[in-house]
Amino acid sequence: MTHFIFVTGGVVSSLGKGISAASVAALLEARGLKVTMVKMDPYINVDPGTMSPFQHGEVFVTEDGAETDLDLGYYERFLRRAKMTKLNNFTSGRVYQDVLNKERRGDYLGGTVQVIPHITDNIKERVLRAGEGYDVAIVEIGGTVGDIESLPFMESVRQLMVELGHKRTMLMHLTLLPYIKSAAELKTKPTQHSVKELLSIGIQPDILICRTEYDVDADTKRKIALFTNVEARAVVVCKDAKTIYQIPRGFYEQNVDDLICERFGFTDLPEADLTDWDNVVEALLNPEYTVRVAMVGKYVELPDAYKSVNEALLHAGIKNRVKVQIDYVNAEELESQDVSILKTADAILVPGGFGERGTEGKMKAIQYARENSIPFLGICLGMQLAVIEYARHVAGMPEASSTEFNRSTKYPLIGLITEWLDERGELQQRSLESDLGGTMRLGAQKSELVEGTKTREVYGKAEITERHRHRYEMNNRFIEAIEQAGMKISGYSSAQHLVETVEIPEHPWFIAVQFHPEFTSSPRDGHPLFASFIDAAKTQHQKSK
């Protein structure tokens, strides 16, 4: 029987609902419970797959190929025993699309289709389905309490809490305690009004997570409890931390897990063992020294556009006991700049992306890394550009390009994938006329790594499974020419022999991959490719001293 914890936010956005929810999930998992998480997004887009990174940040790809909210990345990084799927994230757009399709088919037998019950029933069905087979499902509602877009979700939560009952549901509400410097005190009124807004919907919070920059004394906690109908011990202070990976320990010290276990009747559970999290925090806060990675992209003004890459580099720093400082380099600006901006870098990374804008700047950075023996990692488009750069400057194909940028190029090193097998082994076919949304090669795919290559050495095995998100791929017609020039194809897809990884054997560390290894990195386990990349950056750092 699944128990549900619903997570809402009030006062302002960006309070950290996803991180707080994931920290609670990690705490419950540490007590032996089987936990999953769900994110409900109120926007009308069917999914974030076609949204600009400047609007939404990163699109996180699950193993089964869902394009989801970046919060699902937090969920997977904090949980070890649960992987997110298509069931774990849905939007208003997805719900309305489903309901309208049913109406067109006549499923409602001519009845009037309304928000209540049709939209709310669809939301409830999705929540219950996602929670099947788990002890606890933590469900985050995007946006802020009071937003008009989230009202159907709030009503669905209210109904579920009534239908499932007190012993199977809880509501955790995040709020802000602002500090007024002129009065030298924390203000509780915004929290009171936020809870009042919840109560007007018919929802009583059970736990309050109070975000603040300052310590909160017992009197303030009692005041909050009095005016919000919450137990004083359920008023939890979440003070700004040096790293988000300190949050599980902070919640543990305030007995959040005990509150939940008591409510749900979970008895005889072991105490939470947070040793792994303590080790992560210790390594993060006490690095031996700093290495610098230049990340060359076109969305660098918004670091959330590369959230999983940023986190994977952080995790690699943990594994190598160094601090990884990311120097963001605007690829478009680099096209007209001198490469001297890259001279302080111990390693260079070109992440994924779409479109021609900024590609010449990225290739300029790739060429610099190749010619100056700087460790280089290319991801998705980063691999495609590494191949094009090598073809232009080493393999004698000066007009090499991708058909994404130039359909009439003389040397189409990169072309549209027209056929591939998806994660279920089903044939997928695409053309230039296909819709943009949901039409890429998505999700986990198996690859075979070539024996004797650095990539195989890094992974330590012949077959790997990594997640993909792309429409274009290296053209196999040019494999022989590229390899004769000195670049090695070090990995192929198991099903269609598509190029998955390339490397330069004569370079100290130059690897580029078509997939997205950042999606499977975690703070406790890291990822072998990123760990090896930062190890190479350490070597480069020592050489340059």
Swiss-Prot record:
EC number(s) on file: 6.3.4.2
UniProt binding sites for CTP: S13, D147, I148, E149, K187, T188, K189, P190, T191, Q192, K223
One GO process term, biological-process aspect: pyrimidine nucleobase biosynthetic process
Keyword Zinc among record annotations: no
GO-annotated cellular components: cytosol
Residues holding UTP: S13, K187, T188, K189, P190, T191, Q192, K223
Reactions listed under catalytic activity: UTP + L-glutamine + ATP + H2O = CTP + L-glutamate + ADP + phosphate + 2 H(+); L-glutamine + H2O = L-glutamate + NH4(+); UTP + NH4(+) + ATP = CTP + ADP + phosphate + 2 H(+)
Top class in the EC scheme: ligase
Keywords for the protein's UniProt record, in alphabetical order: ATP-binding, Glutamine amidotransferase, Ligase, Magnesium, Metal-binding, Nucleotide-binding, Pyrimidine biosynthesis
Residue span of region Amidoligase domain: 1-266
UniProt-listed Gene3D superfamilies: 3.40.50.880, P-loop containing nucleotide triphosphate hydrolases (3.40.50.300)
Pathway(s): Pyrimidine metabolism; CTP biosynthesis via de novo pathway; CTP from UDP: step 2/2
PANTHER family: CTP SYNTHASE, CTP SYNTHASE-RELATED
Oligomeric form and interacting partners: Homotetramer.
HAMAP family: PyrG
Leftover remarks: CTPSs have evolved a hybrid strategy for distinguishing between UTP and CTP. The overlapping regions of the product feedback inhibitory and substrate sites recognize a common feature in both compounds, the triphosphate moiety. To differentiate isosteric substrate and product pyrimidine rings, an additional pocket far from the expected kinase/ligase catalytic site, specifically recognizes the cytosine and ribose portions of the product inhibitor.
Protein name: CTP synthase
Organism: Acinetobacter baumannii (strain ACICU)
Taxonomic path: Bacteria, Pseudomonadati, Pseudomonadota, Gammaproteobacteria, Moraxellales
